Amino acid sequence: MTSLSADKVERLGFYNLQELLEDDNLTYKIIRSCVSLNSAITEITKEDHPELSKSFFETANYLYPFGILTLSKIKKMNYKDVEKEYMDKVSSQTADYMHFMKENGVTNQSFIKGTFIGDDLNFCNEIRSAIEITISETNKLKSKN
């Protein structure tokens, strides 16, 4: 990992879902990172592997609004300002992930091999699943009332 990437691309798998529930700042950071990571992989794979790319795109798009909601809860700003700040941070972090993965591709002939990216993708998928389950269970409770 270069010093540029080391500062901007951080392993997400050190955290657990319970920690996310207890800390809005951490929740925001992780969701933003998951959106950025999935966006970066979407960009890197879309030409050679369009079907694979689509699944990363779907995860990024699914998580995207939850990052905005979490940031608006933290910052208590109007929606347009929060959305702009979030979009700027995601774009910047996506570029950082792409740079990191391309550097790794040169070193290891793989964008992911020899890194924590695969583990982080699994962690991001766990977060998406937890959100989906929570929404599903909430809807079930609402329909019973």
Annotate each PLM feature.
Residues 13-14, 46, 102-103:
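Generic signal for short, ordered secondary-structure residues
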Residues 1-25:
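Short N-terminal segments immediately surrounding and downstream of signal-peptide cleavage
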Residues 6-7, 48, 78, 89:
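Alpha-helical protein-protein interaction elements
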Residues 9, 31-34, 38, 82, ...:
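Extended hydrophobic/Leu-rich segments
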Residues 64-145:
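Compact alpha-helical subdomains of small soluble proteins
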Residues 20-77:
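Short N-proximal segments of mature Sec-exported proteins
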